[in-house]
Regions:
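Beta-sandwich/jelly-roll carbohydrate-recognition scaffolds of carbohydrate-active enzymes
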Residues: 2-4
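Alpha-helical interface subdomain recognition
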Residues: 7-12, 80-85, 99, 106-256
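A short core secondary-structure module
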Residues: 10-11, 15-63
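Short, glycine-/Ser/Thr-/acidic-enriched flexible segments
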Residues: 19-20, 26-27, 38-41, 56-58, ...
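Short, charged helix-to-loop "capping" segments that act as catalytic/coupling loops
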Residues: 22-36, 64-75, 132-149, 179-184
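Short alpha-helix boundary/capping segments
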Residues: 24-28, 43, 70-75, 108-118
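Cytochrome P450 core scaffold surrounding the K-helix E-X-X-R motif
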Residues: 62, 92-97
């Protein structure tokens, strides 16, 4: 992280650029949470801080709005922003200097579980649409409804099995987090963060296929759901990071 905040009297002076500042394009957005380096000589997990920055502060600039799969996600929006000698009161510091990583880690476990819950919900919607399309009497090919064609029976069955597996894994991770905390539940949380979005993506893709061209149009929510779930494989850590965490946990069981 290159963005910095330097204490100058009673104010922090902030400099840096930020990509994917979610919500910055919304006219209702009035304040930003800025994570930056305040203590570069501290141990690596104690170098960063979070500071509140009002949007109208001098030196805050939206460079461009970012597109996701070709969409600008207006009015919510994700911004590329630049901060040039932005001054804010030192009271805008959250929790304390060097505690930004601590704040971030505190929400990552619950946040990842929440992501997975939404992924399971998206999968359920896609499966429902797939089934309804499959038995629609107005959608017939070769004298049969669509569910009876190709491998659609298998796709429907696999989707239910995978959804249930994702749900039970997520419930297990949530229960463990509630009883023993984020750190002890880290492997279970990492597992679901990989599994649930990938399951949702597969089911949405199957639903798109049975809908044909309609599946990628504005007539169903499937295309936007697919884009959202694909970004979820990057949000709060990409799949590869979580797989690495799971593998390290498993290997650790057998290392002295």
């Amino acid at each position: 992280m290159q963005a910095t905040a330097v204490l100058d009297g009673d104010e922090y002076v902030i400099n840096g650029e930020k990509w994917w500042t979610s919500g910055a394009g919304d006219p209702r957005c009035k304040i930003l949470i800025f994570m930056c380096v305040t203590n570069p000589d501290n141990p690596k997990h104690q170098r960063h801080s979070m500071i509140l920055v009002p949007m109208e502060t001098e030196g805050v600039e939206i460079k461009q709005m970012m597109h996701v799969f070709g969409y600008d996600d207006a009015p919510h929006g994700h911004a590329h922003m630049k901060f040039t000698n932005v001054r804010v009161p030192k009271e805008n510091l959250l929790l304390g200097e060097g505690r930004g990583f601590e704040i971030a880690q505190g929400r990552l476990g619950p946040g990842r579980i929440h992501h997975c819950m939404r992924a399971i919900g998206a999968g359920e919607v896609a499966l429902e649409l797939m089934c309804k399309r499959g038995i629609d009497p107005n959608k017939v090919a070769f004298g049969k409804n669509l569910a009876q064609l190709g491998a659609n029976f298998d796709y429907i069955a696999e989707s239910r099995i995978e959804l249930n597996a994702a749900r039970f894994l997520t419930l297990d991770a949530a229960a463990k987090m509630d009883t023993v905390g984020n750190k002890v539940a880290a492997s279970e949380i990492a597992q679901i963060k990989v599994f649930a979005p990938n399951v949702a993506l597969k089911i949405i893709d199957r639903a798109i296929q049975i809908h044909g061209g309609e599946g990628v149009s504005q007539l169903t929510p499937l295309a936007s759901m697919y884009a959202h779930m694909r970004t979820l494989r990057l949000a709060d850590g990409p799949d590869e990071v979580h797989r690495r965490a799971v593998a390290r946990y498993e290997l650790g069981k057998y290392m002295s």
